[in-house]
Amino acid sequence: MNGTCIDRTPPCINRAASVWETLQHFHPSRIGHGVRSAEDERLLDFLKKENIHLEVCPTSNVQTNVVNTIQDHPADKIFRHGVSMSINCDAKTISPVTLSSEYALLEKTFNWNKEHFLHCNLQAINHAFCEPSLKEKIRQQLITAYTAAG
């Protein structure tokens, strides 16, 4: 791949084809953004089967016109399909939001609750680029914190 997209638009705007192209050429274990994957059921099936993680940034996707409104965002569809995903807030220079505000937005829009967020965070840990012992330590801390929060 030469760094350009089929129609010269950023990968997350170039529909599901750009995700397929990335998978074919780079064989990643995780993909930044990748929300256009939701436009292709076969792609969602592949991501789930291959356990490829999507880093999802809802507010950024609205701000960059990947989706028109937060109600149009495919985060809930991706989650319900069983694809590994995490919720992120993108770079502060792009989207000056916090992870807490992203969670509040998904809670309000899709009726997500702490079980959704715990699941996404555990998936993020599973796909983190660090030693298994550190993943386990963070996983236990996260579960303890969610349990204590009721």
Positions of predicted regions on the chain:
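Glycine-enriched alpha-helix->loop->beta-strand junction motifs that scaffold or abut catalytic
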Residues: L23-R30, K48-E55, H81-S84
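Histidine/acidic-residue-rich catalytic or RNA/ligand-binding cores of hydrolases
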Residues: C12-H25, E41-L47, T64-D76, K92-L106
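Mid-to-C-terminal alpha-helical segments outside catalytic/metal-binding sites
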Residues: N111-G150
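A post-motif C-terminal structural segment
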Residues: D76-F79, I87
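Catalytic beta/alpha-barrel core
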Residues: S29-A38, Q63
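Conserved, mostly hydrophobic/aromatic
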Residues: I31, L54, D90, E131
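Short acidic/histidine-rich active-site segments
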Residues: M1-I13, V83-T98
